Amino acid sequence: MAHVGNYSRNGYYPYYNNKFCGNFTELMYLIIVEKNRSDGYSNIKKHLVDNIETINYRNEKGWTALMIACAMCDKWSSFKTIRLLLKKGADVHIENNKGRTVLSLMVNIITENKFNIMDLLIDKGADINSQDNKNKTPLIHACKKELDDTYLHACYVLGKSVDPNLEKNDSKTVRYLLDKGADPNIEEHYGKTVLFYAARMKNQDKAYEISKTLIERGGNANHTNHYAETVLIYLCISCSHYSCELIQLLLDNGVDINHQNRIGFTALMCACINIKNPSNFETIKFMLDKGANINLKNNDGFTAFMNIFGNNYFDYIVPVIQIMLDYGADINDKNNNNVTVLMMAVKFAKNDKNMTVINFLLDKGADLEIRNDYDWTALFYACRYSNSSGNNDAVKLLLDYGANVNVNTLLGHTPLIIACQYADNESNIDTVKLLLEYGANPNLTNLDKNTALSVAITWLSKNRYEVVKLLLYYHADSNTYLYLNSEGTVREYNLLVWIVKNIKCNKLDLLMLLIEHGANYSDIKGYIFQENLDNGDIEKFMKFTNIMENIKLVKKSIIDCIPKRVPEIIFNTNSMISQLLSLKWKAYSSDYKDLITLKDLDIIDYLGVYDIDSLYDRIIDITKYAY
């Protein structure tokens, strides 16, 4: 029974379980409180005598008194009230705001008098094939909702099991509607018939039973909706689990297992995308056994095999990949953009499962050097996405398998340039470092003549300083130029000048870092620094450049001394090299025992020599590069 207060024309009242709305007539109110009072039915009967004109009024949700009485029969109102309303002229054809008639609503209601009520409605002319605002018929609604949601929720809250008789309610309702003339081939607004909804029921046994009944009663198993999807394709798209028995039923009744929808997807492709539990592994194998073509491609060039690969890998993906390969999938097949499964796998290499997949693909012969339409290899994908959807371990794995670290695209981009370009977000510093450790050349240029260093300086902000420092440590040329395309004209910029004019954060640190690694600032006019540095930074910059100038002078003095001092050291009779050469000559002399002096013995002891042979070996090793 409904627990509500007294009636008010402006009040909000429940019209169905815990759903409330306004614009309630007094007749509707009397119906929802009928079982609250012993004279509830009498009050309804008396009210209709003077207010018969309100019998077909609709509330805020478009529900009539008849709809409320039918939906809540045995809970709030009685079966005899329904009979009274129909006798007094309640219209069975009125639609609520969603376009549903009272008969359409009844197919989803759980009540002992459900079929008695439906008999009354049909006897009064209710249309068994009426369509709501989305062209759904009562038969479609019977399969669209397996059991009343409120009933199921109540069972869950109270800890009660679902009544087995009610579990069969949907099947019974479907058969009832078919017996009363329901058409199983009417299409709703997307072109789906009732069979589309029946096949995707959560209860697989029920899905099979009702689908079989619909087909036996004339339902077209080979019908396609507005997207050119068969029931089988729709089933594989919308469900995470489905039975092989149901698939066999559809195939037995004419469904083409290799039919492609409007965008080229087959049922097998959809199953591979929607593979969320181990049972679907058996389903995929079943479809392959039944002749599903593993090498068909959709409009984007993806095969079923390619559709397995995404950003949510699962525990049993490797066996799925293996079964697909066993049935003839090409591990190096490409989509319309020439992307391979290896490229997709490394792009989404975020966790251990994905790394297992990449390892497996490489072991099975996935080609590292295939290029997509951007001329990228798998290594480019790994470097670009190593910090977002990817994984730095994937970069290392590809390099360990022999990926060319200095491969370049038609635009001249290398993996290092790409990693530097995106090192603030999708890539990271560790990827840049890894590439450099594996021999990436930081001085290779793209077609714009830019190196990894110039790209890092112009593209990065958060990690700019660290990446630049890393590149310089690995001998990036600090005197490289920056080339930027401005309105179709490529302009050349000195890196120091560009930094001082365009970078706001840490520009002084970056300038000093480049100069420390040899960037030439002597040709740059001083006013450029003065105009673009803060006063405090100008003072620091001047002190730093003075120190660097002194360091240069010291280095120059050392270098200038080398030609003079080296001969003096080499040819000095007291130098170590001279003494070693003398000892070598003595050792090879036949009377070496007479020639060796006490000073020679000190050298022999220092070298750890224990006999004449070891003396030969040590002296030869030390003096072979002495000339």
Swiss-Prot record:
Top-level taxon of the source organism: Viruses
ANK repeats: 61-94, 98-130, 153-186, 190-223, 228-259, 263-296, 300-333, 337-370, 374-407, 411-444, 448-480, 491-523
SMART domains: ANK
Xref: InterPro entries: Ankyrin_rpt, Ankyrin_rpt-contain_sf
Keyword NADP: no
Coiled coil ranges: none
Keywords per UniProt: ANK repeat, Repeat
Protein's name in the database: Putative ankyrin repeat protein L122
Organism annotation: Acanthamoeba polyphaga mimivirus
